[in-house]
Amino acid sequence: RIDPEDDTDFSARFAGEISGGLSVIWERGTFPEVDILYQHINSDGVTSLDYPAFISSDPGYQYAPILSGNIENGLFAIYGDRGAGSIDLKVQKIGLDYLPDWQGTGLVAMDGLDGDVNYTQTYRIGNRDIYHVWEDNRASKKIYGSRLTDLFIEERDGKQLTYSDNSSSETDFSTPVILKTDNKIYTATFDGSSSPKFIRVNKMDENLNNAWDSSGVSLSAVFDMRNALLFETSDGVGCVWSESRGFNYNIYYQKLNENGEITLENEGVELVDSNGDDYIMAVEPSPNEDGKFMIFWMEDAWPAATLKFSKMDVEGN
């Protein structure tokens, strides 16, 4: 048991270490008073702190904590703070002593500006640098990002990364997708300004500048697209999604090169066609190092869903 208090604990997130240790961050309390706490467990299963450390104990609602990195190379706690009414994005560095390293409740990475912040992603660049990328509804839903170096934020309230319509919704599995590679960031958003809803893919350089058209590259849809996933290829990026062009949702694939040019047939290549609704779960390079990819998906067919996998090359064969 990592929390000695008899309270409500939930939304736990974890970060493992090569040494076998484990960092845990979670929410304690019930709305509207919720705090963020942290504890470290060593490789012997013993907690490193006598009592969990408060990442945030400010009045109000702090929520949705995540961890990025590890203790050895730099560990950061990221969470939303709704104590002031709008939702601020906050960051706290956790030191080698397993205690908060920055003063107070950490650094305000982005002021909420009375707009909801969703789908936050954090990517560590080096020991003292991280990217923050998120969806922000300060005026309309768009993807924003910023780079944090030590205590310096390049874009105080975030830099707008996408400019096209972003009709994200968890109801129809059309949430934005963000992929960080060695020196690029790719985004996939769902444009619902016309029917059918379709995907736009864009690429940012290491300074978060649009490398392609600011509206992104649109993928051709026959019916509404949903459940997208991006993965890196040798010459660009691949996008996989679900679409119902018949009775069920099948899985389709499109590939874009470094210049944002579509390289497969216009409406994509069909990867999976089953008797149920198919939703992509993961795409990973083949462990055989043969240049191919393992794809994993869920086939949702009565009476139960099934996890399946297959193998494909970069052209979708």
Where do the language-model regions lie?
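Extracellular, repeat-based ectodomains that mediate carbohydrate processing or recognition
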Residues: 1-317
